[in-house]
Amino acid sequence: MADLDDIKDGKDFGLDRPQQHKAFYLKGSGALDWGMQSRLADIFNPKTGKTIMLAFDHGYFQGPTTGLERIDLHIAPLFEYTDVLMCTRGILRSVVPPETRKPVVLRASGANSILTELSNEAVAVSVEDALRLNVSAMAAQVYIGSEHEHQSIKNIIQLVDQGTRYGMPTMAVTGVGKDMARDQRYFSLATRIAAEMGAHIIKTYYVDKGFERITAGCPVPIVIAGGKKLPEREALEMCYQAIDQGALGVDMGRNIFQSEAPIAMLKAVHAVVHGGETAEKAYQLYLDEK
């Protein structure tokens, strides 16, 4: 027990400086609990407010697609150049070294494949297992306008409810319904519904016309999906336009690991997202690093 006779009365109380409460920097996240904000701060760089996620969760429905045949050989060398990893729990446990020290957004929906209806997903991971894996968020697909729209929205609701109990953020990933055009109106609808259900981050697609309306109408951070493989210059232009129009990051897979020079491409994306560089300057960086 401490010697009570040796306890000195405190003197430096800073009486002329009231304690300050700094608002949390991330859009739509100011009212969240400390643990939730802490995990979001792992994902979104506190200095820039933005993020670069490396997505390599495609195998959960595509299998060993090009570039993902061997995660240990082709993807692991990229870890140090990204902010966040997005993968499944199977890959996380079997391939990702624990000493990687990168926050993880865990793919938490599944139970489908490219051979069946893609929108027919279920929650595939419990929040308890996500906590065991020490991840920073859980992600699930939401398919507005699809055959299984209702179930996909329920999946988001389930993750939000369970995650809120333990301080675990949820990222909703917008899929495209069969009969919906891939345009601003559709993605405004899909992102807003996901946010209204309580998702803390929305991953969606960039569109050439009206993307600023999508980000303005969504009360939580939007990160863009990379989508299909594009020429590097076009992919960087997409990144630049998305950030310029209000996206707070990118979650790219094929445009990174299917690039001729994945590390150079990640450095170029970093220049756009965190450095504010134009696509032209970032592409020159890519060529220099290639």
Curated annotation (Swiss-Prot):
Entry's EC annotation = 4.2.1.-
| Main enzyme class | lyase
> One matching Pfam family, short form?
DeoC
Keywords from the named record: Lyase, Schiff base
Q: Which SUPFAM superfamilies match?
A: Aldolase (SSF51569)
Cited InterPro entries: Aldolase_TIM (IPR013785), DeoC/FbaB/LacD_aldolase (IPR002915), DeoC/FbaB_aldolase (IPR050456), FbaB-like (IPR041720)
CDD domains in the record, alphabetically? Answer: DhnA
Give TM segment ranges.
none
User: What family does the Swiss-Prot or TrEMBL record give for this protein?
Assistant: Belongs to the DeoC/FbaB aldolase family.
Q: What is this protein called?
A: Uncharacterized aldolase PM1278
What organism is listed for this UniProt entry?
Pasteurella multocida (strain Pm70)
